[in-house]
Amino acid sequence: MKSNAICAIATAKGSSALGVIRISGDNLDSLLSHIFTKKLSDRRAVLTDIIANNIIYDNCIVILYSSPKSYTGEDVIEIITHGNPVIMHSIIELLCKNGVSNAAPGEFTERAFLNNKISLEKAEAVSDLISASDIQAVRAAQNSLNGKFYDEVNEVLSCIVSLRAQLESIINFPEDDDTPDLTAKKITEQVERITSLLENILINSKEGRTLNHKRTYAFIGKPNSGKSSIINCLLREDASIVTNIAGTTRDSIEYELSINNKIVTIVDTAGIRATQDKVEVEGIERSIKAVLKADKIFYVVDVSIGLDKDDHAILKNYNITNYDIVFNKIDLEGLESRVIQKSPTEIYLSAINNIGIDLIRDKVDEDFIQVEKVEDLYLARSRHVDHLIDAKECINRCPSHISDCKYDILAEDMRNAHVALSSILGQNPTEELLNEIFTSFCIGK
């Protein structure tokens, strides 16, 4: 178990009204009492100065959560400061001079796991909740954090353990009168229940996994088609340079955008055309890489030119399939009436007049999974789905073992399914797995 005291800023970077510094370790009150002008009281907010060498660092609210009733299971102190990064970093430096170390990413939650305050899949749910890209993903992560995923996996485990115990009894003590009366029919009924529970978890896990994917949309097309102008309208700011000179955008630029409470990444790319300009060629190559990574493409066309042979060549040569055609500059052709047309793969708009831009937002919104009963979902990770599939493959082999009366092989498949599901909950995890999970967290969590 780790016991050295650690600290980190728990709020986002930058200036804000308030900032939070989190500390965890053993005997924090005695370790740090000399830097507070007032005595800390367990689970009570104390208004106190932080002071050292007659220098007041800040007037703060400090809360002590004594072990074991804390997030990490150790003593935890949370310092609420004014949200100036200079103030917060100066307090971190003071703490480090007084026996506290800087926390690694995810180290607070890792300590919570190691101290049996939280299961591994709940620890992962903490990270998923922080990084959730829309409200449905938030709710699904909350379901996992509140134990829905754990409870359902644990229910299957309980059924497997029960059946394993019965099978082992028959295998090891066949002549014992106390062995359970386990017929093929009874075994089949239990296996069918396990299969049904697993299938339900797997369906919800796969759907929940899609919720946690932040979608990427790339805007591509020939130079001067208006890609950057459209993106500026979406962002409601002049984030991309816009001129009448073809080839202004020389690189792929990513932006984060909230559309109907869904966080997406949009990519502005260099215009694709034949050119000898080495810088522009590099930008075009990066545009193609953005296309390969994007979930969907908006192919932007100057409506006054139309979709010509060069556009068709670009779409074909770069194997662009999942795309919508965006006809821009309709104001130049008097085609404003086309905006109201509902085409599944075509959008007509005028970026310069901000007409039809909402059609882009609508298209993005349509791509997101619409879950009517998000309360049934949880944010499962790839490793969870892999373990569920492994367990289900073991269970799927059971009916043939039952019909052949191969109870020893049946028991072994049950054991392997047990191991797979236990891995989801973090029973006997490897150090490599823990490092992979917790290093993906932000500092301070």
What are these regions (language model features)?
Residues 280-304:
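Inter-motif core of Ras-like GTPase G domains
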Residues 266, 300, 326:
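Generic enzyme active-site microenvironment
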Residues 2-9, 13, 135-258, 275-277, ...:
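C-terminal-of-GTPase-core extension/linker across diverse P-loop GTPases
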Residues 1-139, 143, 147:
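A glycine-rich (often HGG/GG-containing) alpha/beta subdomain
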Residues 81-83, 234, 269, 294, ...:
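Glycine-rich, N-terminal phosphate-binding loop of Rossmann-like dinucleotide-binding domains
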Residues 47-66, 247-275, 293:
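Switch I (G2) and immediately adjacent beta-strands of P-loop GTPase domains
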